[in-house]
Amino acid sequence: MNWFETNKGLINLARVDWIEYFTTSTVFHFTGGKMEILGNENETQEFRKQLKTILKQSR
């Protein structure tokens, strides 16, 4: 499984339909809902670096 830990809990990346990137948030869209991870600009950039690493490893 491709689990990614966030400040809102674990996300199963295999169930994510698409991801939207904003300056201070990242939004994961699932069938039937979405989860938004908020942070300041630096926190959001660090979060995305971690996410990109996980996504590369899961390919």
Model features per residue range: what roles?
Residues 2-10, 15-59:
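Acidic, Ser/Thr- and proline-rich intrinsically disordered linker/docking segments
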